[in-house]
Amino acid sequence: MAASSNDASKSAMANSNVTTEVAQTPSKEQDVNGEVEATEEDGANGQLPDNIFQIKIKLPHEPFEIPMTISTAEQVQDLRQSIIEMPNTFQYSCFHLEHKGQRINDFVDLSEVPELGPDSVLEVKEDPYNEKEARLHVIRVRELIGAAGDRTDALHGIMAGLSLHDTVGLDQSGKPKEDGPEQSPLADYDFKSSGAIKNLLPPPQEPAPKCIKSIALSAWNPPPYHLRTKGHLLYLVAMTNENEQHHITSHVTGFYVNKSSNASFDPAPRQGPKALHAHSLLTLLEKLSPSFEASFQQLLEHNAKKELLTIFQLSNAIPANPWLVPPPTSSLTTHQPDLARTQESYLISGVENTDTLRDWNEEFQSTREMPKEAVHDRVFRERLTSKLFADYNDAATRGAMLVARGEIAPLNPTEAKDAQIFVYNNIFYSFGADGVGTFGTEGGDEAARVAVGKDVIGVRAVNNLDIPNLFTSGTVVVDFLGKRIVGQSIVPGIFKQRDPGEHQIDYGAVEGKEIVADDKSFVPLFEQLSKALRVKKHPVWDKDNVRHELEGSVETKGLIGTDGRRYALDLYRLTPLDVAWIEAHWSEPSKDEDAKPSEKNYPHRMATLRPELVESYGRLKLREYVKNEIDKKANKARGGRRRLPKAQKKADAGKEVDGEKKAEAEPEQDRVDISGFSFALNPDVFSGQTPQSDEDKAEWAKDEAEVRAACDHLQTEVIPRMITELKDGEVGFPMDGQSLSSLLHKRGVNIRYLGKIAELSDKPDPRLQALKRLIVQEMIARGFKHFANSKLRNVSAPFSAACVAHLLNCLLGADANAKPVAECDEEIKRMISTPEDDFSFEKLTPESLKKEVIAQIALRYRYDLGESWVESGKELQLLREVSLKLGLQLQTRQYGFTKETLTNGAAVPTPAAPQTNGSSTSSKKKKNKTITPPRADSPAVSLPSQTFHADDILNIVPVIKEASPKSLLAEEALEAGRMSVAQDQKELGQELLLESLQLHEQIYGVLHPEVARAYHTLSNLLFNLDDKASALELAHKAVIVSERTLGVDHADTVLAYLNLGLFEHASGNTKAALVYVRHALELWKIIYGADHPDSITTLNNAAVMLQAMKQYHESRIWFEASLAICEDVSGKTSINTATLLFQTAQALALDKDMRGAVNRMRESYNIFKDVLGAEDRNTKEAESWLEQLTQSAVSQAKQLNDLAKGRIRRIQLTGRNPLRPAAATPSVSDAAAAAGGQRTGTGRVDQRKIEDLLKYIEGESSKTPTKKRTQNPRKRTQKP
């Protein structure tokens, strides 16, 4: 928690440098211990490595001495931070450390402190305060004692960074759900109901104990001049729990109670019993208030119940904003009086506010110039870079929101709105619109909007390449209230007036493409950039047809700043145009402004190929090159045995290679030299360049053919292969719009191809039908987003909630009210509306909105929705997609999407989708009433009966695109660890993985999306290495960090919960595992709806876990549910279905339903026999079981007495661990255990370990039991 205060105080580079550590770990103590544990395993006989040892810290007050384990790899400031955060030393914030009487510099490594070794004594010496230290101390103490209350942050939305991890499995009163002796956590799960939105919110929390009623700056602040010279820094006023008010002076020596009151000013020390003085404000408050110490202890205990990561403040990433939040009346969002809330900006950054003004560009570039030879230099550089980007993104987004709201004066107020530019906090802002006609021929505003989005991606690509001496400006794109705003750090010299004849730009196109500059100093820099990004060196021609050789696109500019650095600007054209798309769907704007033909009216000409596609095409070309080389060699040396060359293998590894992997072999000494291979695309073909010489024309034609071939590769290879993989279950099936987008982008497919993919998916296959439904939903959400933005853009802020509510009613509430009414307050409208406000949204009807959205989909995705519209029962999913895309935060309540649910559900806060209205139990409804009280509408206003009201839109948050680079060092360590594990060097692998983990945490800070992914990956790898305890701990962390940085219902969070369930089960906590699995399934329903194709696996695992708990009847229900989805998705005669029938039969046998078991096993046997043949092992296995089950069914009918005793005869069951990938055989029943659990030769039982199960869940192993290896019915929950 100290993080927030220290974080808040970052002033400049050196200062941010000090505070970066704050975000590193919630408690240094834990981190060091964690490090000790990790290394203990590796050290000989459990000895600690030499650089980790224990020292003593001597304190000026009780307890006077504490032991501490340190690592010499850390800096002194890390140790200082650990002291600040330890419970015994909370009160210290202004101090320095001494060793043997010598002061230690905070900025050196501990290894540089002379004679520091085991059992050394470091002394904490309290320093005199200055004004800044005093302010930070006050902030810190307010945080510590829980007096800071709720912050209203302009950037972070309501409940930003929420985590549900600690409250999963609790009922609405916040207590663990009581399971009867016969019940499991899955007892009342409804497979077909729609998602219950109560699962996205924590239950009401008990309020934290109060240590003090209030503490704030007093009205006598700041000290007058004559008292400043005497060392007075601040005046505070505190109200204790005993209702006593004390005025306190903050002095250079510490804090004391003074003689002031609210009416009279006398800051001299008080006399008598209240004559109290202490160096720390915390100690002074303890002395002042008798109840303080006890309540502070209770507060610490209250906070200790929570997982530290769930309450720690995010400082290196912008927290995720939930799209559903509690109503303002909820106990989760109470608004408390707190005078100091308005004083915080002064406390953080002082009177002049200079602490927060930073020269962003200089910080970015000087960080880039830091040394990166040694590993510790790289760690420090990347850590600083990560922190700097996080601070910049935060500051730039805050400024962009002020620009959007019109709170910053433009630099050019006389120009058109879209052309206005702004500077705030040393960041330059402009609109993502074509204000000055730059993109007139490319599509105007639409082209400009796309260009700035692509520019961010380009800047990120260049940042990741980290080319020495090539610099970029910090770039952030913010979508807020319908406007797109670009924030850039100011490149020195960009606004400089050049002399006549001097160009504004030094490399690339100047003023359109009429003049081309080609400063030679950029050539070596752009050459490295082009090589990495596969950009071909090519000529371009200016308006006088003068030829210029450029390394990059003519659109990519180079500028020599006044600081002498070379900057790359306008990085939106790093890849060629998608010429196939442009020729099919774009036509040049005509001179006389005629409307374009509908088949050629794509909104802009900025349709470029994705960098991933260029890479994929490059790998294809490399394979062709290698194959040709092999053929050449083969022709030279006929008849020799040939081996696949290494280069080929490398090119093939993990890529989309079908048959080529099994290429011919070649003699041992042969290698294919790929140094002769080169592949690059010309980004300027089809962009209006006219080659002059014949040689250039021929080369240009070649370049054009190559780009056409790449476009063809996308349409004929990449997209069809992706659809085939989704159909066959080769890749994880997307859950929502975000996972669908990332699936497409990873394969280099642009979102504009959604319509084409929907057409190709329109086949009878159930998986493809599910894909088509998801794509149609995504197209509707995106079409609606574009239309909603066009309306929101021209509405002033007070009307935005009414506008959004009306648009949502037209989209989703038409069945509930076919004529929704916009809820604009007419009085406010009369008072503040301007001619620029566009209230045309009030006239919209569901029909006109549908027409607009269908037009957007036809325009952008070339897809005719026909009769399809919002799918019945999927309104909640579409509402979620739209809210995430527009940054909406809606009040949590039951939204009725039909007339019935609107009337029935008016007072009931549980959500219910139309088709299951009334299906939830009454007890659930009662429970829910406690979490969300009915809306407190003013009785004077009667609102029309419609799904959404303006009051439901509680907040709109910005949607951010940013360019922060990944840490190469952390990625390299992770990859090295992976490779070592793959090569069976387990100990080395484990060491490298733990090092990678440490690097991720050091560089990014713990709460960061990259760290969430690292936790997820590492937990799986460590689990495979049999380090179950570490894997489980990391799986818990992955869930929390994913929830807080990506969102409580993000697709990655669902996968993290499923992972956690498996690891908990493997560690013997099956009940906890089922709680997490259930939560993941409830989230799945909200994100996707019921029956996701990949949920077969999860239901199957839950069934196996239930068997482990001997909940046989419930287990059977879950197997049957899994089977039902499998029959829908894979068909009734697939191998997958046969496998599940096989397992279900066993579950039925355990549930003593012998007749059902025989029927299911017979179905399984018939499918295996038809598909695989009678001789296949799977068929024989099923046949053997069928015989045994039939005999048991016969004997069961005869011997009802035996059944009453609970014995199932002649079924050979195993007593081994029941959880295995296929759940092929049920766990032992009591009867079989009593009978000794003998096994016959025919009942071969799958005895795979939990590691295999993990592989299966991650999609690496087959779904069928070991005896059924013929075909691989993959069902993965992993993302591709």
UniProtKB/Swiss-Prot annotation:
CDD domains noted in UniProt: CLU-central
Q: List compositional bias (Basic and acidic residues) regions by residue number.
A: 649-669, 1245-1261
Q: Region entry Disordered: which residue ranges?
A: 1-49, 169-189, 633-669, 905-943, 1214-1280
Listed InterPro entries: CLU-central (IPR033646), CLU_dom (IPR025697), CLU_N (IPR028275), CLU_prot (IPR027523), GSKIP_dom_sf (IPR023231), TPR-like_helical_dom_sf (IPR011990), TPR_rpt (IPR019734)
Q: Where is the composition biased (Low complexity)?
A: 1221-1235
Q: What are the recorded Gene Ontology BP terms?
A: intracellular distribution of mitochondria; mitochondrion organization
Q: Where is the composition biased (Acidic residues)?
A: 32-43
| KW Cytoplasm (keyword) present | yes
A GO MF label: mRNA binding
On the tree of life, the source organism's domain of life is Eukaryota
Q: Which residues does the UniProt record annotate as the domain Clu? A: 338-582
- Kindly list the GO CC terms recorded for this protein: cytoplasm
Question: Which coarse location class applies to the principal site listed for this UniProt protein?
Answer: cytoplasm
Subcellular localization, per the record? Cytoplasm
Compositionally skewed regions (Polar residues) per UniProt: 1-27
The record, for SMART domains, names:
TPR
Keyword annotations for this protein, in alphabetical order, are: Cytoplasm
Stretches of Basic residues bias are at: 635-648, 1265-1280
Q: Does the keyword Cytoplasm apply?
A: yes
Summarize the protein's role: mRNA-binding protein involved in proper cytoplasmic distribution of mitochondria.
Q: How does it assemble?
A: May associate with the eukaryotic translation initiation factor 3 (eIF-3) complex.
Q: Which PANTHER family match?
A: CLUSTERED MITOCHONDRIA PROTEIN HOMOLOG, EUKARYOTIC TRANSLATION INITIATION FACTOR 3 SUBUNIT EIF-3
Q: Which family does it belong to?
A: Belongs to the CLU family.
Q: What protein does this entry describe? A: Clustered mitochondria protein homolog
Organism name: Phaeosphaeria nodorum (strain SN15 / ATCC MYA-4574 / FGSC 10173) (Glume blotch fungus)
